[in-house]
Amino acid sequence: MSTPYLLIDAGNSRVKWALVQADGTQTHSGAFSHGGQLVKGTGDPLQSRHEPDWSALPAPGSAWLSNVAGDAVARRIDAFIDRHWPGLARTTVRSAAQQCGVTNAYTTPSQLGSDRWAGMIGARAAFPGEPLLIATFGTATTLEALTADGVFVGGLIAPGWSLMMRSLGEHTAQLPTLDSTAARGLLDGDNAAGQREPAERGAWFATDTPRSLSSGCALAQIGLIERMWRHLQDEWQVSVRLVVGGGAAGELVQALSVPYTRHDSLVLAGLALIAAQAPVYPSTHTRPV
C-alpha cells in the first residue's frame, strides 16, 4: 500500500480531514470544530473535545491543506500536525489560473478562496463533461458556475443561513438571535412553543417570530440558488447539474424545488487530485504547489 496523503479542509467553523491513498481511496476521515468548544484551561480552539485521535493512523507522506480560517488557525493546525508527525512536509494550496482541468476566470486568480478552488476541481472530477452550479452552505453561502469544459466563469458569495439569522438578532432591537441548532427544529414544522403548524397555512408561513426568522433566512438562501440555477439553464441552453454541500445543506435542501446532487467532500476530493498531480519535491516542512 502506498504512503497516504493527509488532507485538511479548514473552513470558518470546522476542520475536515482525510487520509487518502494515491489512487484516491479514502481510508480514514473526520471533522472537528476549531472554535468555541474548548477544553477547560487550554485556551486553544484546536484542543476541543472533538479533536481527532490520530495516534493509531498510518503516517502520511505529506499533508495538503486548504485554509480559509486565517493565520491563527493555520498555526494551530501546524502545531497539531507536528504533535503527531513532526516535520511532515505540507503544502497550503492556493488558487491558480489553471489546475487539474479547471480554468479560473477570476481577474486575479489568487483571490479565489482555496476551498472554492479545490471544490471545483473535485466537482469536475466527480461529474466530468457536465456544466455545474456548485452551492456550498457554510458560514458563507457560495456559488460557482463551471462550464462543461471546466471553465469557472464566476461565482457569488452571500451570508450563510446561520450568519444571516445571527446578524438579524444582533442588529435589531426585538428579534431573537437564533443559532442553527435552535433553527433546525423550527424548519421541521414546529413553532416556538413546540407545536406543529397547521398544514393549510403552508409549510413556510410561520405564526411566531423565531420560525419566521428561520424560514425566511432559509428561503433567502434557496431563492438565490434556484434563481441562479435557472439563469444558467437559460443562458447556456443546457441541463445544469446543481451540486450542493456544506454544513447547513442538510437543513436547507429540503426547501429546494429543483433537482440537485448532494456531495459533502468536494474540497477534500479536490485536494486529493491536487496532491496526486503535484510534482515531487525533496521532503521539506513547506513547499510550493
Swiss-Prot record:
<comment type="pathway">
    <text>Cofactor biosynthesis; coenzyme A biosynthesis; CoA from (R)-pantothenate: step 1/5.</text>
</comment>
<dbReference type="GO" id="GO:0015937">
    <property type="term" value="P:coenzyme A biosynthetic process"/>
</dbReference>
<feature type="binding site">
    <location>
        <position position="139"/>
    </location>
    <ligand>
        <name>ATP</name>
    </ligand>
</feature>
<comment type="similarity">
    <text>Belongs to the type III pantothenate kinase family.</text>
</comment>
<feature type="binding site">
    <location>
        <begin position="9"/>
        <end position="16"/>
    </location>
    <ligand>
        <name>ATP</name>
    </ligand>
</feature>
<keyword id="KW-0418">Kinase</keyword>
<dbReference type="GO" id="GO:0005737">
    <property type="term" value="C:cytoplasm"/>
</dbReference>
<keyword id="KW-0808">Transferase</keyword>
<protein>
    <recommendedName>
        <fullName>Type III pantothenate kinase</fullName>
        <ecNumber>2.7.1.33</ecNumber>
    </recommendedName>
</protein>
<dbReference type="InterPro" id="IPR004619">
    <property type="entry name" value="Type_III_PanK"/>
</dbReference>
<comment type="function">
    <text>Catalyzes the phosphorylation of pantothenate (Pan), the first step in CoA biosynthesis.</text>
</comment>
<feature type="binding site">
    <location>
        <position position="106"/>
    </location>
    <ligand>
        <name>substrate</name>
    </ligand>
</feature>
<keyword id="KW-0963">Cytoplasm</keyword>
<feature type="active site" description="Proton acceptor">
    <location>
        <position position="115"/>
    </location>
</feature>
<comment type="subunit">
    <text>Homodimer.</text>
</comment>
<dbReference type="InterPro" id="IPR043129">
    <property type="entry name" value="ATPase_NBD"/>
</dbReference>
<feature type="binding site">
    <location>
        <begin position="113"/>
        <end position="116"/>
    </location>
    <ligand>
        <name>substrate</name>
    </ligand>
</feature>
<keyword id="KW-0547">Nucleotide-binding</keyword>
<dbReference type="GO" id="GO:0004594">
    <property type="term" value="F:pantothenate kinase activity"/>
</dbReference>
<keyword id="KW-0173">Coenzyme A biosynthesis</keyword>
<dbReference type="GO" id="GO:0005524">
    <property type="term" value="F:ATP binding"/>
</dbReference>
<dbReference type="Pfam" id="PF03309">
    <property type="entry name" value="Pan_kinase"/>
</dbReference>
<feature type="binding site">
    <location>
        <position position="209"/>
    </location>
    <ligand>
        <name>substrate</name>
    </ligand>
</feature>
<keyword id="KW-0630">Potassium</keyword>
<keyword id="KW-0067">ATP-binding</keyword>
